[in-house]
Curated annotation (Swiss-Prot):
Cellular component terms per the entry's GO annotation: host cell nucleus
Region of interest (Required for nuclear localization), residue spans: 1103-1132
Pfam families per the UniProt record, alphabetical: Viral_DNA_bp
Subcellular location: Host nucleus
Organism: Human herpesvirus 8 type P (isolate GK18)
Record-level GO BP terms: bidirectional double-stranded viral DNA replication; DNA replication
Name of this chain's protein: Major DNA-binding protein
Annotated keywords: DNA replication, DNA-binding, Host nucleus
Task of the protein: Plays several crucial roles in viral infection. Participates in the opening of the viral DNA origin to initiate replication by interacting with the origin-binding protein. May disrupt loops, hairpins and other secondary structures present on ssDNA to reduce and eliminate pausing of viral DNA polymerase at specific sites during elongation. Promotes viral DNA recombination by performing strand-transfer, characterized by the ability to transfer a DNA strand from a linear duplex to a complementary single-stranded DNA circle. Can also catalyze the renaturation of complementary single strands.
Source organism phylogeny: Viruses, Duplodnaviria, Heunggongvirae, Peploviricota, Herviviricetes
Family named by the database record: Belongs to the herpesviridae major DNA-binding protein family.
Amino acid sequence: MALKGPQTLEENIGSAAPTGPCGYLYAYVTHNFPIGEASLLGNGYPEAKVFSLPLLHGLTVESDFPLNVKAVHKKIDATTASVKLTSYHREAIVFHNTHLFQPIFQGKGLEKLCRESRELFGFSTFVEQQHKGTLWSPEACPQLPCANEIFMAVIVTEGFKERLYGGKLVPVPSQTTPVHIGEHQAFKIPLYDEDLFGPSRAQELCRFYNPDISRYLHDSIFTGIAQALRVKDVSTVIQASERQFVHDQYKIPKLVQAKDFPQCASRGTDGSTLMVIDSLVAELGMSYGLSFIEGPQDSCEVLNYDTWPIFENCETPDARLRALEVWHAEQALHIGAQLFAANSVLYLTRVAKLPQKNQRGDANMYNSFYLQHGLGYLSEATVKENGASAFKGVPVSALDGSSYTLQHLAYASSFSPHLLARMCYYLQFLPHHKNTNSQSYNVVDYVGTAAPSQMCDLCQGQCPAVCINTLFYRMKDRFPPVLSNVKRDPYVITGTAGTYNDLEILGNFATFREREEEGNPVEDAPKYTYWQLCQNITEKLASMGISEGGDALRTLIVDIPSFVKVFKGIDSTVEAELLKFINCMIKNNYNFRENIKSVHHILQFACNVYWQAPCPVFLTLYYKSLLTVIQDICLTSCMMYEQDNPAVGIVPSEWLKMHFQTMWTNFKGACFDKGAITGGELKIVHQSMFCDLFDTDAAIGGMFAPARMQVRIARAMLMVPKTIKIKNRIIFSNSTGAESIQAGFMKPASQRDSYIVGGPYMKFLNALHKTLFPSTKTSALYLWHKIGQTTKNPILPGVSGEHLTELCNYVKASSQAFEEINVLDLVPDTLTSYAKIKLNSSILRACGQTQFYATTLSCLSPVTQLVPAEEYPHVLGPVGLSSPDEYRVKVAGRSVTIVQSTLKQAVSTNGRLRPIITVPLVVNKYTGSNGNTNVFHCANLGYFSGRGVDRNLRPESVPFKKNNVSSMLRKRHVIMTPLVDRLVKRIVGINSGEFEAEAVKRSVQNVLEDRDNPNLPKTVVLELVKHLGSSCASLTEEDVIYYLGPYAVLGDEVLSLLSTVGQAGVPWTAEGVASVIQDIIDDCELQFVGPEEPCLIQGQSVVEELFPSPGVPSLTVGKKRKIASLLSDLDL
């Protein structure tokens, strides 16, 4: 976010932000407004009085709506106004005429469930505030249309949402402005802080306060932030956040007196340390985390609702609704992962310390404190810092032992019925995974018998098909168990990937950045980077008709010779590029054998809130992910500072009064650019000394009188994060780790008997079985399993014995060679993946990596499908049912959209499409080398915990290969849903399209690079005919020179052959042209003779050459044999 280059420190998005109000009230005219689309984007439920829509240009705000603003806060004196830089919150909260919109989830009783769950786990409830003054009402605003013709929403800045919660914002109706948003009209009324109008006229202000909006903010936003900070008193978090932003109280502790601590872990010396570190981490998370959220952000294409690619081919409103439904189904994969993973960021409940017996010397000291998962800890009793009881715990009878319950799902949704409704909507797209222990599971019987019963305390049996109890029954086996772990696990976060990711098989290998970063002089020798190598391989494969999108196997391979030709062509292409790559590394003195040991996959997590998926659930996940990473980073700094300043005998609040400001200053330098988070500090200025404002006294009276005032920026320096850098180590380090971990990476020394059926060609041999052997009835798997067990070749009807022998020999030899060098443990399923696996395996072998398997990274991408709706009762809607037979009749013939994951998409390809990512990570801390005492941190890729997360994450068995459980440690996964081609248009550059002539030239150049071809002109002519056909008859000399490029010396021969073909009158096809030029140029074999070999040279006899004259040394002898030659010439 910090600007670099020729720009000055003051030239940034913060300084460019205009001055403006703290928020707006929008009144949307219902005519032409897309009510149905907005309903799918909202988070309403049947009893909801308010709901939210995402902040989108073309839907909720106009196209030129400023995302960053220097919001006017108060008057410092009669001529000066104080402004605070902040960005707008991602939601528009609808509060008037909400009945026009359909609920996103139709189940009833969500408010009751969330309210009871909140009380069960000891979290504070919302308390409506009483206002003595006049409250604003849309009916009393003459500038707006009739109340029945509009619906209204409030849009507020991040910094002033606490003021909106407390009813401290004042509308100024005299500044009502009509705007056009997409195809509909709206009116907006600015909201200013009550402090702007001064205390003398406070009683005359008409404030905006809606208790339903305040309840929404309390439940859907502030409760999630409180959970991330491990504080159960939500009102304290709101008050602290308001004081921090409005009164600039960033450097003083604000939460510690509201913190409660586990009763069992707060005793003794370790208990005092744990309480202090927990409080300090929460305070730093509050100060820095909320400051990051409030800061300025860059705009992005995701916000442009009018240009979403998912709507491009939609000609009817129903088609647009269907496109939104499919998009939401694809997003459901991420929500399911967060709810089903035991190590989800939603389930972090406490700060813990590793037991002494689990710590391995000094290497683990910096990671001894960590953020602990475990829903079981929610039931434990807690105490205040002085030992007074805070929460008595959850009664055993209130929950279902170690089983996941609806109360835990309500906790995961921050006890917000709006977020819970949206989560349930996503869960409806996910299939159930029946557990073999749940023999009684039957959705049809449950919906027809148990669900309609009045015993349901949420819907009383009135809507069994859409009741949350029915949904939970269907998905129950996938939720994690409720445990109290004592283990440091990675935590799963969700957000959007950054722009630059190194996700090829070898990640950031051979980027040549290390030497430049270390201060070494930049060499003049051209650098052939690993990234360029991958790009060149992709382009070479594309010229052969092989692409990442689809290989067109059946077009390229039509028989056995073409099968061998295609794969040999790939092999030769890979070998040629690999040789160039290695030679370049040698020329640049690049120590690739050592550098390969430290390569990583690098995945960026974007800290820009506007890049997140437009959904309130994803917004909550972003807030929690960012706050969690910040707290995880500062754990080590807090631990080390507490060791130097022990807290024994001092309560956390007193200790923080003495030390928090110092710790806040120290963490400022330890946060950015230390490994995990990148960012910068912005210096905020205002370009003009004055800004346009209005006379506040006149505004109270309903009049608008413009005025100009001086501007004073409250905080001139802001820290803004940019990305979280997540790394995945590729090469196994044998320095530490248990034997079980080492066994998971160890490559077996013996060759497998099934090296063919488990090798790189089996996928293609099976897919093309009928193409290669059209008359055989034997299955491909059986045939090649037998071929791999013997040295003989089979006899198959209709297949040439010569061709079959060639195919078997190639597959056997290549499979054995692949087995020897393969340390990636991947089986290719496309021609592109075959080429990349072969290339990277060869690189690893050249670097000496042959003993251990490398870590591989795969991505799970969503695939939607329509299936019969018998197992998905929500398709019926809120209807009554009386029996299973009635349910079967009503659901018969219906279909429903569900989503599954696939591993077919390449992670390197998806990584370039700005995907939504759900990724497990753990932040490890370490000190620098060579005596550097600074603490650095690294966000390392981890693993998903839980069998219900996704079926592709469970331990698999590779065909004919025995894998132990620890072998899954070398297979890492990321869930990705690309935004490009869905919400963001693919960027098409000026030179992105390729002309036909360029493709032809590239094909001709590839032919000319074959140095073993004795008849290059003949091959060039055939290649030109293949691409141009009859157009070859009119090729000029300039055309031929262009296609030949640096081989233009062959131009005359090629033109001569083309002229001959034209005179022959044959059709311009490959067969016709070949029949003519075959007689002109025949293949010939050259014989070369060495300088010492006997031959007749210029009439000299062989005898004279073998027996030279005495005293005359032989001229045909090499340098190294000069003495021997002289001795042989002497007449002894």
